[in-house]
Amino acid sequence: MFSIPFPFLGAIVLVLLLAQMTWRQGSVVLANRPLRILLGGYALLSVLVGLRWGHGVTLLLPLQATVAVALAAWSWCCFGALAHGAGRWRVLHALPALAVVLLYAGWPDGVETVVAGTLAGYGLALLRLARRGPDALGLA
């Protein structure tokens, strides 16, 4: 029987949402570029997860871990910028993704720890930001 892994369905929904954000009433809307990049990244991550768990493709695990960590940082950059503007140290948010790439080259067993720690850290930071309510996102 034909089946589609659930992450692929999630990716389709994200791509449809991205298309709806981009093409409104017959014209291309280029606003909210960081959010559109974020949605595209999550669609890519959903496809990578679907390939891993739906079809057993393990070759893309390094890319999956790197994209996951990069999207956590990018999520913070998108929503943090709405709260207090784009910071000067924004480039430092690329360090966890760089650490994952370097760990895959030198010590692959440490990747899971870095991924879990990074996702937990950015998740807690986003929860802390969300706890302040919608008024905290003054630049939205």
Task: Map each language-model feature to its residues.
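N-terminal low-complexity or simple alpha-helical regulatory segments
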Residues: 1-113, 126-135
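Short, intrinsically disordered, charge-balanced linker/junction segments flanking boundaries
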Residues: 136-140
